[in-house]
Design a protein with these regions (language model features):
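Acidic-basic catalytic patches of nuclease active cores, encompassing PD-(D/E)XK
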Residues: 1-43
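Short, well-structured alpha-helical interface segments that form or flank functional binding sites
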Residues: 16, 20, 51, 82-86
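Short glycine/proline-enriched coil/turn segments at helix->beta-strand junctions
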Residues: 34, 58-61, 94-99
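Domain-level recognition of nuclease-like catalytic cores that cleave nucleotide substrates
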Residues: 101-147
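Active-site beta-strand-loop-beta-strand hairpin of nuclease catalytic cores
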Residues: 52-68
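Catalytic cores of nucleic-acid endonucleases
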Residues: 65-120
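N-terminal interaction modules that seed assembly of large macromolecular complexes
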Residues: 41-55
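A generic structural signal for well-ordered alpha-helical segments
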Residues: 29, 95, 124-126
């Protein structure tokens, strides 16, 4: 078996774990009467504009899904946290007409006594636009709104 130090335990691949999580969020949205399309492209930018593909969206909602967890040693996954920061910037640059939803897999850490999302909010609050809704999947299909 290959040594994959950054491979999450218990899943065939990190990419597959992300896709599985996206499918759970899509199922949740559809069950709540929200129809979205995958890979919704929207022009974003500061001076110039370029298309950016959000995980899901429609004419009024943009959705990003992140399925990262704490590292095996209990530390924050810094490279993945950068991806979350990038998602916040993309939401910030997206047209104001969209409601922005950020879904993350719940990952609790005993050392910090908080979820990875709570850690992100505590440490990177200044990067989070006030216009987004931060949510995590907690067990089954229950979604908790943190902001």
């Amino acid at each position: 078996m290959e040594n994959k130090p950054y491979q999450r335990k218990g899943v065939s691949s990190n990419t597959q774990a992300g896709k599985d999580f996206e499918n759970k969020i899509l199922f949740f949205l559809e069950n709540n009467g929200i129809t979205v399309e995958p890979q919704t492209k929207v022009e974003i930018g500061i001076n110039a504009k370029k298309e950016h593909a959000f995980d899901f969206g429609n004419n009024s909602i943009l959705v990003e899904c992140k399925s990262q967890t704490w590292t095996e040693t209990g530390n924050a996954p810094s490279a993945k946290i950068k991806n979350w920061s990038d998602a916040m910037f993309s939401f910030y640059l997206a047209p104001k007409k969209y409601k922005k939803l950020f879904f993350v897999e719940m990952s609790f850490n005993q050392k910090y006594c908080k979820t990875l999302l709570e850690y992100f909010i505590d440490h990177y609050f200044y990067l989070i636009p006030s216009i987004i809704s931060l949510r995590f999947r907690h067990g089954g299909e229950k979604i908790t709104n943190l902001c």
